[in-house]
Amino acid sequence: MGNCAKTPWHRGSKERWQWPGSPLGGSRPSPGPRTEEQEGTQGYSVLGSLVGPACIFLRPSIAATQLDRELRPEEIEELQIAFQEFDRDRDGYIGYRELGACMRTLGYMPTEMELIEISQQISGGKVDFEDFVELMGPKLLAETADMIGVRELRDAFREFDTNGDGCISVGELRAALKALLGERLSQREVDEILQDIDLNGDGLVDFEEFVRMMSR
């Protein structure tokens, strides 16, 4: 496979990837009506303001122009950083389950069924970086306004992870929330947020859990 990091990538070069339920080369399907559970988490969107530049917001008129251009070098670099983050054995490939975590790092929340359908398009159940760019490039162009930069998220994660052990403890997150939001959140609200974030109940927030939190 070629090194996409060296050559500007054209969205029209290959179009074999598609989101399940979407036209070929189209954007992610629009979500259905919000459930009661989803409405209950809407209040946590205030957490998105904690990282400031982590979210890139563009006016719709500007975002519309993103579809008909090449990926910029810094965008390919962002995809490469995300890919390498989950290519843990450094063999140049990631499996479809790792692909799901990698996509979440970039701000996408694929369902298990979507990942299974995507995996059926993958030869050998793995993707290399060129395949990854083919899959994520159109999404990056189509939804620039919703993207979350992995580098900015990493920087924000390190701000929370004050002892540098790779995980955010309940105490670290509580202290950060209090410092950043002050009295805007009660102790009960902080505890509810922590309970919602700590998906595996180990008392620690790892990077993937942090990404899920910031993507709300």
UniProtKB/Swiss-Prot annotation:
Which keywords does this Swiss-Prot/TrEMBL entry list?
A: Calcium, Cell membrane, Cytoplasm, Golgi apparatus, Hearing, Lipoprotein, Membrane, Metal-binding, Myristate, Repeat, Sensory transduction, Vision
Task: Write one Gene Ontology MF term.
Answer: calcium channel regulator activity
Encoding gene (name)? Cabp2
Where the protein is mainly located, per its record? Answer: cytoplasm
What changes when the gene is disrupted? Mice exhibit synaptic hearing impairment and impaired auditory brainstem responses. Enhanced inactivation of Ca(2+) influx in inner hair cells (IHCs), whereas its amplitude and voltage dependence of activation is normal. Reduced normal spontaneous and sound-evoked firing of spiral ganglion neurons (SGNs) seen. Mice exhibit normal retinal morphology but altered light responses of retinal ganglion cells.
Domain (EF-hand) spans: 74-109, 125-142, 148-183, 185-216
Low complexity bias: start-end ranges: 20-29
Membrane topology is: Lipid-anchor
Tell me, in a sentence or two, what this protein's role is.
Required for sound encoding at inner hair cells (IHCs) synapses, likely via inhibition of the inactivation of voltage-gated calcium channel of type 1.3 (Cav1.3) in the IHCs. Required for the normal transfer of light signals through the retina.
Cite the binding residues for Ca(2+) 1.
D87, D89, D91, Y93, E98
| Keyword hit for Calcium | yes
UniProt subcellular location = Cytoplasm, Perinuclear region; Cell membrane; Golgi apparatus
* GO terms classed as biological process: sensory perception of sound; visual perception
The record lists Ca(2+) 2 as bound by D161, N163, D165, C167, E172
Q: Does the keyword Secreted apply?
A: no
Q: Which domain of life is it from?
A: Eukaryota
Protein name per the record? Calcium-binding protein 2
Q: Lipid anchor (N-myristoyl glycine) at which residues? A: G2
List positions binding Ca(2+) 3.
Answer: D198, N200, D202, E209
Q: Which GO terms describe its cellular component?
A: Golgi apparatus; perinuclear region of cytoplasm; plasma membrane
Give the CDD domains listed for this entry.
EFh
Tissue-specificity statement: Expressed in the inner hair cells (IHCs), outer hair cells,(OHCs) and vestibular hair cells within the ear and in the retina (at protein level). Expressed in the retinal cone type 6 ON-bipolar cells and type 1 OFF-bipolar cells (at protein level). Expressed in the organ of Corti and spiral ganglion neurons in the cochlea (at protein level).
Concerning SMART domains, the annotation shows: EFh
Region listing for Disordered, in residue ranges: 1-41
